[in-house]
C-alpha cells in the first residue's frame, strides 16, 4: 500500500510507514516548489493558503476534487443551492471551463483558475525540490 493525502513532513511519513504503508506519495507540496511549472498566481495561492482554504468541488471538471476555494467555486455553489443548478458531468464540465481556466491563467486571475490542492496545502512554502526533499527525509 502507498499512503497519500495529508502527508506534509517527516513525522507524517514515519507514521504511515509504521502503519504498514511501503511508501508515501506527496503531491501538493511539490506544486509550490521553484521548479514547478504552474502559474505564478497558483503558486502564490498555495503558499498563502490556510488549513481551511480547500473545499471539495465539481465546479471546474465535473469530477469531485479538492482545491482552494475561489470566486468561481463559490458562485457555482450558490447556483446549486439557490436554483438547483449542478455542474455537468466530466468531461463536459471540464471542456466547458477549459477556456475560462486558460484565460484566467494567462491573466494571473486565481478567481477563475482551478487551484487543485490537498489538505496539507497550509504546509506549502516557497522552496526548492531539494530543500523540500531534505525536509521530508530528515527528522526535525
Describe the predicted segments one by one:
Residues 2, 8-140:
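Conserved active-site-proximal phosphate/metal-binding subdomains
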Amino acid at each position: 500500500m502507498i499512503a497519500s493525502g495529508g502527508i506534509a513532513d517527516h513525522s507524517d511519513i514515519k507514521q504511515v510507514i509504521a502503519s504498514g504503508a511501503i511508501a508515501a506519495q506527496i503531491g501538493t507540496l511539490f506544486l509550490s516548489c521553484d521548479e514547478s511549472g504552474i502559474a505564478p498566481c497558483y503558486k502564490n495561492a498555495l503558499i498563502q493558503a490556510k488549513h481551511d482554504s480547500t473545499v471539495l468541488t465539481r465546479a471546474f471538471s465535473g469530477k469531485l476534487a479538492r482545491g482552494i476555494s475561489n470566486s468561481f467555486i463559490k458562485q457555482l455553489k450558490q447556483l446549486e443551492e439557490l436554483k438547483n443548478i449542478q455542474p455537468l458531468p466530466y468531461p463536459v464540465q471540464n471542456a466547458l471551463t477549459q477556456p475560462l481556466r486558460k484565460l484566467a491563467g494567462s491573466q494571473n486571475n486565481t478567481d477563475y483558475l482551478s487551484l487543485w490542492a490537498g489538505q496539507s496545502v497550509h504546509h506549502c512554502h516557497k522552496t526548492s525540490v531539494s530543500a523540500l526533499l531534505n525536509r521530508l527525509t530528515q527528522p526535525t
